[in-house]
Amino acid sequence: MEIINGERLVLGTCYYPEHWDESLWRDDLKRMLENGIEVIRIAEFAWSKIERYEGVFNYDFFDRFLDVAADMGMKVIFCTPTATPPAWLTEKYPEVLNANMDGVLYRHGGRRHYNYNSPKYQELTTIIVEKSASHYAKHPAIIGWQIDNELNCEKNEFYSESDTIAFRKFLMEKYGSIDALNEAWGTNFWNQTYNSFEEVYVPRTTLSNNTNPHEVLDYTRFVSDSACKFAKLQSDIIRKYIKPGDFITTNGLFGNLDNQRMTNESLDFITYDSYPNFAYCLDAYNKDNFLKDRMWSRNLSEVRAVSKNFGIMEQQSGANGWNTGMAAPTPKPGQMTLWTMQSVAHGADYVSYFRWRTCTYGTEIYWHGILDYSGRDNRRLAEVKSVHEKFQKLSEIAGSKYEAKVGFLKDYDNAWDSQLDVWHEKVEWKSQLGIFEAAQRTHTPMDYIYLRDDVTAEDLKPYSVLFYPHPVL
């Protein structure tokens, strides 16, 4: 089964069998199928369910679950679990941890606390992905794979010792000599001149928190390069084992990452995590904000710039919050339908709701899913079924192209440069937001187009109007 095949629209949800007693599995899957959910995503935070102790692999848990899924006709997207390394790993190998700008390591207990450039983490990632893919990939329930989870989410800067070593290598390959680097970075200013690459570090705290903008732009390129290589490391392994027709994806879009490059190198298509009610969180209620959840049309247009047709791996289905912060209120009746159709209108052929059951423990205890804590049927589940019925009538739009005559030109270097320049950032963002809001107010379809080496004049010919505000590079 392919979920992006141009033939029909497909509904899914995110499920965590490790959170629930096995006696609930069959009933959960049965209720999903009865309400139009055909696909589930699993295992993105479950490293210890496969490798509880270093080098000791146990496949029984997910073997049992996948067999139940296959027996009931539920299809599965299986994830690599590298977003949350287990405690034994970070305790034994602290060099895998990411650090803040002052070099203080982020410790076990959260997620995404590793760094891409640790040779040890790359080694252990290779092992867990190889073991998982070689064992599970041929299972009939599995139709695709998700790499990691939300690459560059929460933290898209890396300051560990491994990152400094990798950054030096990145710069040596780019410039060839330290003199060329000094010239490009303008290091004569404030006597920043380097005599060797060993004197260069990832950006660190300085007296006035000032930065060399040329260094930081190269550093941002390096972060993107590191994330792309980490995704490709995993994709190359999975490709050796997957069944014909199965796919590889990951869920984005996050900062300091060239999503087009990552998709072209490692994925069959990209997916996105869509939480439109973030627009209403906290003090946003008091703001005169015309766009509100229509702001997510801008985000979805960015996704469409990466993949013409894409998937939504996490579509908001409930109130959102961690124990440390409030994020978004419960969708009103009909809002799940609105947001789902918003995603479909922008090119999503697959929409997966986050999550099936609301977790009863952990940081995301207030991040509600389709079902509340009781697990009983509710109005949101009824709305999912209603969406499925609508999908049945909309199959002819699967694989169709979003038609726009207005294009907004972007490129990563200018986007990254603007975020490190307080003068340029405000002007660029205000222009971008103003153009998007004008398009929304006039119901004018608009595309984002990223200028890359493979973009030609022919690619721009369909547009009657092109905006390219404030490029400085």
What would you call each of these model-derived segments?
Residues 10-22, 43-62, 107-126, 150-156, ...:
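The substrate-binding groove and active-site-proximal loops of carbohydrate-active enzymes
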Residues 26-106, 129-133, 234-242, 472:
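Aromatic-lined substrate-binding rim segments of carbohydrate-active enzymes
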Residues 197-200, 244, 275-278, 284-473:
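Carbohydrate-binding surfaces of carbohydrate-active enzymes
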Residues 102-269, 273-298:
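Polysaccharide-binding and catalytic clefts of secreted carbohydrate-active enzymes
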Residues 1-24, 29-38, 285:
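An acidic-aromatic substrate-binding cleft motif
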Residues 7-9, 36-38, 70-76, 138-143, ...:
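Short, well-ordered coil/turn segments that N-cap beta-strands
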Residues 19-34, 125-131, 252-263, 332-341, ...:
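Short, acidic/polar
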Residues 13, 32, 40, 69, ...:
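Conserved, mostly hydrophobic/aromatic
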